[in-house]
C-alpha cells in the first residue's frame, strides 16, 4: 500500500517527502483555503515537492464546467489528478475526461455502489471517506473492503484511496483491507512513526553508550 499526504501545507509536504515514505498528495478546497494562498500557485509548488499524483479539486457542480476546470488544472503539471465529487454531474465529467487522458479522483465516496459507478465512468482513483462514515455510525472500512473486492473481482483498474483517515489504526485497517493507497494528514503520519518503547529503547542505548565513553 502507498501513502499519500492529505494536506496543502507545503512545509508539511516538504518534511514528509524527505522521509521517503509518501508517493503523492491529496488536497481539497478546504485545505487550500486554510493556507490563504493562490490555488494554482499552491498546486504548482506541491508538484515540485513530490514525484507522484497531486489531487486538486474542481469547484463547479456542472459537468461542462468541471471539464473546463479540469483541463485548466491539468495544464499545471502532468502529475495533477482532478478531484471530482461523487454526484451525477461528476460522473458525466469523469466519462468526458477519461478519453482525453485526464486522470480523475472521485471524492466524497460513501458506498461501494458509488465507487463502482465512478470506476465504470473511468475514474483513475476513488476515495471512500472512512472517518466520516465512522462518525455517522457506519463501518467506513467495510466500504473500502467491499470496493477493493469488487474491483479485484472484475479486474477494474481504478485504484482505491482510503480517505478521511483520523488515526494510525485507520491506516493499518486500510492496509489489511487491501486499499491501494491511504491518504493521511501530517499528524497521523507523525503518529505512525512514533512509539513510546522506541523512545525508551533509544534513551537506554544512548545512556549505556555515554557510560561506556566515561570509562
From Swiss-Prot:
Family listed: Belongs to the transaldolase family. Type 3B subfamily.
One GO cellular component, as annotated: cytoplasm
Gene Ontology process terms (BP): carbohydrate metabolic process; pentose-phosphate shunt
InterPro entries associated with the record: Aldolase_TIM, TAL/FSA, Transaldolase_3B, Transaldolase_3B/F6P_aldolase, Transaldolase_AS, TSA/FSA_arc/bac
Major location category of this protein: cytoplasm
Pathway annotation from the record: Carbohydrate degradation; pentose phosphate pathway; D-glyceraldehyde 3-phosphate and beta-D-fructose 6-phosphate from D-ribose 5-phosphate and D-xylulose 5-phosphate (non-oxidative stage): step 2/3
MF term (GO), any: transaldolase activity
Entry annotated with the keyword Transmembrane: no
Subcellular location: Cytoplasm
Catalytic activity: D-sedoheptulose 7-phosphate + D-glyceraldehyde 3-phosphate = D-erythrose 4-phosphate + beta-D-fructose 6-phosphate
Designated name of the protein: Probable transaldolase
